[in-house]
Amino acid sequence: MASPGLGLLLALGLPLLPARWGRAWGQTLDPHVNENGTITPSAPGSGSNGALSQEAITAIIVVFSLLAAVLLAVGLVLLLRKLREKRQTQGTYRPSSEEQFNHAAEARAPQDSKETVRGCLPI
């Protein structure tokens, strides 16, 4: 079951992934290449200090917000389905269960009265 939120999540999240994957594996956008063809890492102070960029923070917020919205929508649908089912069975007439309930109520003596139920012998 595909949801519209999943399509939106993929549309917004997938363009950000390739750029982030390259940086995660130590690749930079402009590597320094020596005369002999070896790539030298950039200076320790020139790169980021391990903090996430603004785009990464925004992408994380968007992804988790969409995930929360999808979970909320699924929960709401399940709740409405349960309420609709309960409303459909609330007013139904079931004679067999009604009779069982009435016979059980007649057989029990009221808790607060001192009367005995007719037809029962005292113990």
UniProtKB/Swiss-Prot annotation:
Residues 81-120 are cytoplasmic. One of its GO terms (biological process) is protein localization to plasma membrane. Residues 1-26 form the signal peptide. It comes from the Eukaryota. Keywords: Cell junction, Cell membrane, Glycoprotein, Membrane, Signal, Tight junction, Transmembrane, Transmembrane helix. It is found in: Apical cell membrane; Cell junction, Tight junction. One of its GO terms (cellular component) is subapical complex. Glycans are attached at residue 36. One of its GO terms (molecular function) is SH3 domain binding. Residues 96-117 have a biased composition (Basic and acidic residues). The chain crosses the membrane at residues 60-80. The PDZ-binding motif is involved in the interactions with PARD6A and PALS1. Component of a complex composed of CRB3, PALS1 and PATJ. Interacts (via C-terminus) with PALS1 (via PDZ domain). Interacts with PARD6A. Interacts (via intracellular domain) with EPB41L5. Interacts with WDR83. Involved in the establishment of cell polarity in mammalian epithelial cells. Regulates the morphogenesis of tight junctions. Involved in promoting phosphorylation and cytoplasmic retention of transcriptional coactivators YAP1 and WWTR1/TAZ which leads to suppression of TGFB1-dependent transcription of target genes such as CCN2/CTGF, SERPINE1/PAI1, SNAI1/SNAIL1 and SMAD7. This is Protein crumbs homolog 3. The gene is CRB3.
